[in-house]
């Protein structure tokens, strides 16, 4: 059990930091394939509003990513990655990383699936033809790589959150054992 705790303490903050940074980058790049929808002048209704409709999801993911990065730095700053005896700050920061990991993963999954469903309704062939007719070399892919990346990232975020809760439980068990051993020595 100590080896698992030691491993998670040592690497969880770095893995979480990388995943939360990737979430922020993902949020920034999520709508990139359809940014050109804002300038589309074709006859299909709803295309120009498609891009704006998903900006709130991008904003939410970006805010989650930024807040999660701050919480992960707090985890590291409270020395949750090296303390052998656990104090309340260790438990709070560990639980916060777990909550943010799971919340970010679920939010990313929902946002990606909704965005993909909306993307599937776009008249991509007509849009590509419109830009070709107007002398632009802009094209929209029928299935951009952003969707599988979103699903993979969401699973990784949830797994990081679960790992943080496992670490929380291991720290709690270690703290209980520590308190019992102190009581045994006092008697």
Residue ranges with predicted function:
Residues 139, 146-147, 154, 181, ...:
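Charged, low-complexity cytosol-facing tails and large interhelical loops of integral membrane proteins
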Residues 54-65, 147-159:
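Alpha-helical transmembrane segments of polytopic membrane proteins
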Residues 2-5, 12, 74-82, 108-119, ...:
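Cytosolic juxtamembrane helix at the C-terminal end of the final transmembrane segment
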Residues 1-11, 58-59, 81, 85-88, ...:
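Structural motif marking the loop-to-transmembrane transition
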Residues 34-55, 106-150:
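Interfacial non-cytosolic loop connecting adjacent transmembrane helices
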Residues 1-62:
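Transmembrane alpha-helical insertion/packing segments
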Residues 72-101, 105:
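Loop-to-transmembrane helix junctions at the membrane interface
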Residues 16-27, 65-72, 97-104, 108, ...:
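Helical transmembrane-bundle signal
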């Amino acid at each position: 059990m100590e080896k698992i705790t030691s491993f998670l303490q040592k690497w969880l903050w770095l893995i979480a930091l990388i995943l939360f940074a990737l979430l922020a980058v993902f949020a920034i790049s999520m709508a990139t394939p359809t940014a050109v929808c804002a300038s589309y002048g074709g006859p299909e209704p709803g295309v120009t509003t498609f891009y704006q409709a998903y900006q709130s999801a991008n904003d939410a993911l970006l805010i989650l990513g930024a807040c999660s990065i701050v919480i992960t730095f707090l985890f590291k700053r409270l020395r949750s990655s090296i303390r052998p005896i656990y104090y309340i700050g260790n438990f709070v920061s560990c639980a916060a990383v777990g909550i943010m990991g799971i919340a970010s993963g679920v939010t990313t999954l929902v946002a990606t699936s909704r965005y993909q469903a909306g993307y599937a309704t776009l008249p991509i062939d007509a849009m590509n033809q419109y830009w070709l007719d107007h002398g632009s070399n802009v094209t929209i892919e029928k299935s951009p790589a952003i969707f599988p990346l979103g699903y993979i990232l969401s699973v990784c975020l949830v797994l990081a959150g679960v790992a943080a809760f496992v670490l929380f439980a291991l720290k709690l068990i270690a703290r209980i054992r520590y308190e019992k051993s102190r009581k045994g020595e006092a008697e």
